[in-house]
């Protein structure tokens, strides 16, 4: 089961938090579609800003958006000009008051989404699919990853028959729920068609904190 399921979805509510932090009785469907619209809009607007993921909180007529990015300067802009433009566009898109918080990702080579996107962009620039995977693995392990696995599938090197090639280093325990495993999928548009890129990064175990509020010694 751990081999097939999305590692992030399997761990939500155990060691990972939800990316949509709200609940609605009646308007759940419409608000969910609004969330999808916001996420798609941010991805399109900030294509070059290395956005990993977006968290959305709702309260009454207000939306709080946290953008996790490897390039916060590009999102904020000079004197906050870019983030102000983005806020105004989101206000118009949702017809609600939007507040944006930008959170910097310190180690971009330990973020699966950013690693997958980086591999995909290099493949589009005709880089060797073997070399880009090995380089990504080396960088992640140097930054302290416990394990990493990458896979590229499609018409590799322009071959007539599509296949998949994967490389890994360290351990990636997909069945262990306390294992902090980041996963992402990206696509590269090449002259031979699409290539799929998958990345799993094991960053160590997340142990539950002991609850000592009940007294005891």
Swiss-Prot record:
Q: Name one Pfam family in it.
A: Ribosomal_S3_C
KH type-2 domain: residues covered? 38-106
Name a single GO cellular component: cytosolic small ribosomal subunit
Which residue spans adopt a coiled-coil conformation according to this UniProt entry? none
Q: List the molecular function annotations (GO) for this entry.
A: mRNA binding; rRNA binding; structural constituent of ribosome
- Keyword Ribosomal protein listed: yes
Query: Which InterPro entries does the record match to this protein?
Result: KH_dom, KH_dom-like_a/b, KH_dom_type_2, KH_sf_prok-type, Ribosomal_S3_C_sf, Ribosomal_uS3_bac-typ, Ribosomal_uS3_C, Ribosomal_uS3_CS
Instruction: Report any one BP term from Gene Ontology.
Output: translation
The entry's keywords: Ribonucleoprotein, Ribosomal protein, RNA-binding, rRNA-binding
Q: Which family does it belong to?
A: Belongs to the universal ribosomal protein uS3 family.
Which purpose does this protein serve, as stated in its record? Binds the lower part of the 30S subunit head. Binds mRNA in the 70S ribosome, positioning it for translation.
Q: Can you state the subunit structure given in the record?
A: Part of the 30S ribosomal subunit. Forms a tight complex with proteins S10 and S14.
- What this protein is called in its record is Small ribosomal subunit protein uS3
Organism equals Staphylococcus aureus (strain COL)
Write the lineage as a comma-separated list: Bacteria, Bacillati, Bacillota, Bacilli, Bacillales
């Amino acid at each position: 089961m751990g081999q097939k399921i999305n590692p992030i979805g399997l761990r939500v509510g155990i060691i990972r938090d939800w990316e949509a932090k709200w609940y609605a009785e009646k308007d759940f469907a419409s608000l969910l579609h609004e969330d999808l619209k916001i996420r798609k809009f941010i991805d399109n607007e900030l294509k070059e800003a290395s956005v990993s993921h977006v968290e959305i909180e709702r309260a009454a007529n207000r939306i709080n958006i946290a953008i996790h990015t490897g390039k916060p300067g590009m999102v904020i802009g000079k004197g906050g000009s870019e983030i102000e433009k983005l806020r105004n566009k989101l206000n118009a898109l949702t017809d609600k008051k939007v507040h944006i918080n930008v959170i910097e990702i310190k180690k971009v080579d330990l973020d699966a989404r950013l690693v997958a996107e980086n591999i995909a962009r290099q493949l589009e620039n005709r880089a060797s699919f073997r070399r880009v995977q090995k380089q990504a693995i080396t960088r992640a392990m140097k930054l302290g990853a416990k394990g990493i696995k990458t896979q590229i599938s499609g018409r590799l090197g322009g071959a007539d028959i599509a296949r998949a090639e994967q490389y890994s280093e360290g351990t990636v325990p997909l069945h262990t729920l306390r294992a902090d495993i980041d996963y992402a999928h990206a696509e590269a548009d090449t002259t031979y068609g699409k290539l799929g890129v998958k990345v799993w990064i094991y960053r160590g175990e997340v142990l539950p904190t002991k609850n000592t509020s009940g007294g005891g010694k």
